C-alpha cells in the first residue's frame, strides 16, 4: 500500500508545473523572512539556477523557502542534528549537517562545495545562496547571493 501511494505521489508531482504555479500564486508576504524566501525562489527561477543553498541554524529559513514549492533543488545546511532531522521532512530540501564556521565567507564556500558535490553542479551553473550573518543566533536571515560555478 505504501509503495502504491509513493508511486502515485511521484507521478502526480512530475505532472505539476511548479514554475507556472509559483508565478501565478498569490503569496502573502508578511515579514522580512517571507520576502527573502520568496525572492530566493524567484531569483532561482529567473536565473535558471541549478540549486538553492540555505544556511540555517533553526531550519526556519529552509522551511520557508520550501513552502513556496520552488522547482529548484534546495540544500539546507545546519549545525544541529535535531534541525537536520526535521529538515528531512521539508518539501524539496536535502539537509546536510555541517560544522560551525568562523566566518560567513567560509560558511558560504563550504556550502557551495557541498552543493556542487550533492547536485553534480557544472561550470557555468548558477546557485542562489541565502542565510544570515554568523553570530550564533537564529532568526537573522539577511542575505541572498548568486554564485556561478
Segments from the language model and where they lie:
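Long, charged amphipathic helices and adjacent flexible linkers at domain junctions
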Residues: 4-41
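Structural signal for hydrophobic packing residues in well-ordered secondary-structure cores
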Residues: 6-16, 44, 69, 91, ...
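Flexible, glycine/charged-enriched surface loops at secondary-structure junctions
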Residues: 14-25, 50, 55, 121-125
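Conserved mixed alpha/beta catalytic, RNA-binding, or beta-rich assembly cores of soluble enzyme
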Residues: 37, 50-53, 58-63, 67-73
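Structural motif
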Residues: 50-53, 72-75, 93-96, 125-128, ...
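Nucleotide-binding motor/catalytic cores of P-loop/tubulin-like NTPases across gene-expression machines
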Residues: 61-63, 69-106
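Beta-strand/loop-dominated core regions that host nucleotide or nucleotide-derived cofactor-binding catalytic loops
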Residues: 94-98, 109, 113-114, 141-148
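C-terminal binding/interaction regions
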Residues: 108, 119-130, 134, 141-147
Amino acid at each position: 500500500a505504501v509503495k502504491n501511494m509513493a508511486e502515485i505521489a511521484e507521478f502526480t508531482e512530475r505532472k505539476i508545473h511548479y514554475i507556472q504555479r509559483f508565478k501565478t500564486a498569490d503569496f502573502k508576504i508578511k515579514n522580512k523572512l517571507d520576502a527573502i524566501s520568496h525572492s530566493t525562489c524567484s531569483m532561482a527561477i529567473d536565473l535558471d539556477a541549478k540549486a538553492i543553498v540555505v544556511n540555517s541554524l533553526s531550519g526556519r529559513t529552509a522551511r520557508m523557502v520550501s513552502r513556496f514549492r520552488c522547482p529548484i533543488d534546495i540544500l539546507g545546511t545546519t549545525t544541529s542534528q535535531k534541525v537536520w532531522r526535521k529538515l528531512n521532512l521539508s518539501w524539496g530540501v536535502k539537509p546536510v549537517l555541517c560544522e560551525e564556521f568562523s566566518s560567513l565567507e567560509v560558511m558560504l564556500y563550504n556550502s557551495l562545495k557541498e552543493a556542487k558535490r550533492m547536485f553534480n553542479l557544472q561550470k557555468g551553473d548558477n546557485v542562489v545562496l541565502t542565510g544570515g550573518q554568523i553570530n550564533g543566533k537564529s532568526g537573522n536571515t539577511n542575505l541572498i547571493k548568486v554564485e556561478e560555478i
